[in-house]
Amino acid sequence: MLKKFNNYFSLFLILIYLSGCVSAVIGGVATVGIATVQERSLKDSAIDLKLELQLQKKLFEASKDKLFAYVDVIIIEQRIMLIGNVESQEVRDLATKISWEVSPKIKAVLNELTIGGKTTLVSEAKDVRISLSLSGLLIGDVDISDINFSHSVSKQVIFLIGIAKNDDELNQVIYHARTIKGVRKVISHIILKNDKKRM
């Protein structure tokens, strides 16, 4: 899995956030070119980034051994998706509780954390291969605006989240995920651009 890299990167962003430089990060990411194809507004993108930094910080402070090192966080339009592996139902529930407490702006917490059964290096390598394959397929498909979708892979299960412009795009993203060799399951939290959940 890409968890360790993502978590180290998040730590870097947390340090930037604590030093008051988060606006520089947001400014660097929010380019005009991205704004023309991204279903999320620049305001929502900025809010999501700030919320992710805050949540990663809280998970780290709560117990880095139990939560932070094994949990991926993806936030799109204030909908949080938690992916990874934790040691008990208590820790899983705590992750949900902490997520809701981050901000009143949170609209949903999609807790996809599994309990027990630590991953092996072989399993993590498979997850990385699957993740890279999916990214390549989405980028290479001219009918998909890949910037509107995020994913995480845990134990060869692909978790999708994002905003599709229509049913065709949504189904095509899921199709690509399912066709990758070695994928055990695909779980989608993708919504359509006209979904009431976005209101």
Task: Label each residue range with its predicted role.
Residues L11-I14:
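Classic N-terminal secretory signal peptides
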